[in-house]
Amino acid sequence: MVKRRYSILCVMFAILIGFSSIAFSQQTTYAKEKVTKVTYTTKMKNDKECMIVKGLSSKKKTIWSYKTPYRTCAKCSTFKCIVKKNRVYVFDYLRLLILNKNNGKRLYTVKNTPERGHFATVTNKYNCYEIGYIGNNSGRLYKISPKGKILYKSAKISKYSYGWPSSIKVSGKYVYVGCYKFNGQPKPVTIKFNEKNGKFLGEK
């Protein structure tokens, strides 16, 4: 009788190990699926909006997702998303989140960045340059390091009679910002900054 009970327990234990192995295998396979595409959409609710970012597999299966807090709607977008190599940059109101593209893990959080109307670009070395259209910290050029540190923020471009930034580009030793000049009849111009220190250098 004792041997029979022992045999039954051994069989049950073996079955349990088998099921556990299968479950673990499925979980590992799912976790190892490669993210081939990142999507982002905005969602409205009671005059507020949020952004939902997802990492998808080649079969459009959601590997990970991230949802920002709801923010009050404004005439300029509160959010922006840039995918660069194996990173995802989520510009969310007054902060920047840098995520791992493969698993959605947050790598760095940068606070006190431009509020709305984000114009930004990221280089192959993960240096990020950003300028905001409106709101707190707008009109200042920011350079953010690969490790999520603000290296500099320039003086406001309004100090030099410019405003309403509309584009940004990094080329060689300079950062170029498309904007408008305050001169009665605003006209589109391109101004430039020293890439290393953010010093304003006038029009291109």
Segments the model singles out, each with a brief description of its role:
Residues T28-K32, C73-V83, P114-K125, Y160-S171:
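Repeated scaffold domains used in trafficking and secretory/extracellular systems
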Residues T39-K43, D92, E130-I134, V177-K181:
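Recurrent small/Gly-Pro-centered beta-turn motifs in extracellular repeat architectures
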Residues C10-S21:
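Bacterial N-terminal signal peptides
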Residues D47-I52, L94-L97, N136-Y142, G184-I191:
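Structural motif
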Residues S57-K60, N100-N103, S145-G148, N194-N197:
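Short loop/turn segments that connect beta-strands within beta-propeller blades
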Residues T36-V38, R87, Y126-Y129, Y174-Y176:
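Conserved core beta-strand positions within WD40 beta-propeller blades
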Residues F19-E33:
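Sec-dependent signal peptide cleavage junction
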Residues T36-Y40, K61-T72, R106-N112, R140, ...:
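Aromatic (tryptophan-biased) beta-strands that constitute blades/sheets of beta-rich domains
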